[in-house]
């Protein structure tokens, strides 16, 4: 079985993002990108992956927007 070299890092990052979202009410993609030392586009792809996995992630654009876990 061939394993993607980036897979372990991505899994660690996804878990890290989820941890941040559970601890903070709201964060922005630039904040996450800086924390995990990746691009904003990578964070956006990671958020899409979390959503596809059934994690209720909500993104709001514009002033006062950000990324959060849906309550409820």
Where do the language-model regions lie?
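Short, basic/aromatic recognition patches that contact phosphate-bearing ligands
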Residues: 1-72
């Amino acid at each position: 079985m061939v394993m993607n070299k980036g897979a372990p890092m991505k899994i660690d990052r996804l878990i890290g993002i989820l941890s941040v979202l559970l601890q903070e009410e709201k964060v922005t993609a630039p904040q996450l990108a800086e924390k995990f030392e990746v691009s904003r586009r990578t964070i956006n792809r990671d958020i899409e992956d979390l959503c596809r996995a059934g994690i209720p992630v909500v993104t709001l654009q514009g002033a006062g927007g950000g990324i959060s876990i849906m309550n409820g």
